[in-house]
Amino acid sequence: MALTPADWQMIAKAALPNMGKYLEWRSLWREAAQAQARANAAALTPEQRDWTFDLLTGQRAYSAKPDKRYQWKVLPQGMSNSPTMCQLYVQKALLPVREQFPSLILLLYMDDILLCHKDLTMLQKAYPFLLKTLSQWGLQIATEKVQISDTGQFLGSVVSPDKIVPQKVEIRRDHLHTLNDFQKLLGDINWLRPFLKIPSAELRPLFSILEGDPHISSPRTLTLAANQALQKVEKALQNAQLQRIEDSQPFSLCVFKTAQLPTAVLWQNGPLLWIHPNVSPAKIIDWYPDAIAQLALKGLKAAITHFGQSPYLLIVPYTAAQVQTLAAASNDWAVLVTSFSGKIDNHYPKHPILQFAQNQSVVFPQITVRNPLKNGIVVYTDGSKTGIGAYVANGKVVSKQYNENSPQVVECLVVLEVLKTFLKPLNIVSDSYYVVNAVNLLEVAGVIKPSSRVANIFQQIQLVLLSRRSPVYITHVRAHSGLPGPMALGNDLADKATKVVAAALSSPVEAARNFHNNFHVTAETLRSRFSLTRKEARDIVTQCQSCCEFLPVPHVGINPRGIRPLQVWQMDVTHVSSFGKLQYLHVSIDTCSGIMFASPLTGEKASHVIQHCLEAWSAWGKPRLLKTDNGPAYTSQKFQQFCRQMDVTHLTGLPYNPQGQGIVERAHRTLKAYLIKQKRGTFEETVPRAPRVSVSLALFTLNFLNIDAHGHTAAERHCSEPDRPNEMVKWKNVLDNKWYGPDPILIRSRGAICVFPQNEDNPFWVPERLTRKIQTDQGNTNVPRLGDVQGVNNKERAALGDNVDISTPNDGDV
């Protein structure tokens, strides 16, 4: 019994532990597997053997044509035969004919076969051999469809000895009603475009009908411009023809500067194939030199596809010096120059057909230059989302209001105004890459995508550039760089002009709304900062689309708070999945001042908690008491030892009771809300969207911008002594039944007062009934002000504000 390859694999695996004999076993397995494969192949017929993929034998007889090494068994679902299998089968049947007549041109497309040769005698010999060979493969040719002539039809085109004429297409207008109807018609026209010399720009009104409602049954109408384009197609079809290529003669590729988009043709004493670019450009501004290079690359590929060789000559509308300049500035031209091994020229053939293609006047920049102009005036431009545009020339600032809310669009309008105002040599400095790149491309731009909102502005700038006589140089400068020098100063003047004008034109409500759109602060902050009414401030917050879903809800319960900063802190970890690896957000908050600190870290282990504590304490100070939940990182020995070393008292709340850390839990929600709101804000262009940067911006707003009812921010409450009532009281200690004071009041509550004895480290809470209020006068805390004192007659009664003395009350007075 012969061993199968699977058996030999089992033997090889069993021998793996013995590494010394591994190579020997591998060689034996290979030889046995090949022997078994040869034995199996011997039982196959020659036809079956040709279609078998022999992996183990190592033979490479069919490696040049990989498709022949596979046995096709599965047909596409729903088909009775496979077009691919049909092609492969007929190609294999035609192989003996190709080998017998190597000079014969034999083309196959599905069930159509074309035989071509210069000598009719050779065709007469090849045709009977073809019939005989196909009959051996079970294939028959319908003799009634055979055409033997110097002029024949193949794939709908008429092939004559010197030219190829496309099939005649009847264009009917009576059934053009829906998107589907126009799609079919334009598909036929696009298929015939290699026969037509109509530039793409002339057919644009026709192809623009396909835009709009995407449903195939959506209505469409034939516009006047589209009807005129359709008439041009009908006229071109009447005389459409291509020349037959002469294999012994070279051919060239010509790229013409037609309007808006270039047109190319493979040429050999006549058009061999017309090549057109895509009708709809991928970019808003299609730079004409790049479009020529892209079409030239497309033409080189078409030459290889149709004729099997590259043209010997490439003709473009540029001189040799201009080609070198474009190759250094454009990636497409660099690829074209390095990939084409032939000659590049700019002298077109003299032929009447080619006279149509010279109507694009400017194909190389003449007005926009690449180097600064020494004799040109320098103008700095800037635009803002408030619609204010400004430019600075010779120290003079000019501002203008536009009805736009995009900084790029406003700056485009400012540049247009500058080009119209300054007609002499001009240097423009802008802080928008978008505007600088657009202006550099517009002079020789082909098609400007009409769907863009700035298309109309770009067209106006292009017309102004084409009508100018003096050169223009435009460059970019980074805004808010803080660098010294006149360029940074000029840009800063233009930038400040947009803000000053916007502030002067806007009302306090509008200014508050813009400030809120940037930072999404609270209504109390807006009310204090911009002197608004409570209703106006609340309306701004409630009308904000980013803040309306985060409005506070009433809460119940209370957490113990510190009466001074750095007394009691709460700390916890929350998750922000959008931060990726830094999704573990550690948050700490001071329960007295409300100062908050957060660190996006890669985990929530004890080491990460310690890292967060050190970062927070280095920024805002070390608390006396730190309260957390019962998480494993907080209850670990490592963190407990860290707290002891740092002399921080660590407390944990009840297990599974997050309300014990309600202050930091609320801080989680507040911080996440600001991360979401400020992500939708106006800092997208200036602030990078990194996790730490986003957290820092939110903390800056919460700690330094939001204010309380007394007009203080969290940072101010944390870094300064809190406002205390200017009151001194004497108070009785119920433990020793003695009176103390006078001491200052820290906090008042219902029925109780918190006093801070001057000789104690901690404050005390005392019932309000056990206190006696003493009003101070110029720092004298021992002399209270009383309107009437025992022992003083009516004539000597003290007036309000007089200084009198009072003895310390005894126990009976209380």
From Swiss-Prot:
Tell me which residue ranges form Integrase-type zinc fingers: 507-548
The UniProt keyword set, sorted, is:
DNA integration, DNA-binding, Endonuclease, Hydrolase, Magnesium, Metal-binding, Nuclease, Nucleotidyltransferase, RNA-directed DNA polymerase, Transferase, Transposable element, Viral genome integration, Virus entry into host cell, Zinc, Zinc-finger
An annotated GO BP: viral genome integration into host DNA
Name a GO molecular-function annotation. zinc ion binding
Q: Does the keyword ATP-binding apply?
A: no
Q: Entry's Pfam families?
A: Gag_p24, IN_DBD_C, Integrase_Zn, RNase_H, rve, RVT_1, RVT_thumb
The catalysed reaction is: Endonucleolytic cleavage to 5'-phosphomonoester; DNA(n) + a 2'-deoxyribonucleoside 5'-triphosphate = DNA(n+1) + diphosphate
Its family? Belongs to the retroviral Pol polyprotein family.
Q: Mind telling me what this protein is named?
A: Intracisternal A-particle Pol-related polyprotein
Organism annotation: Mouse intracisternal a-particle IL3 (IAP-IL3)
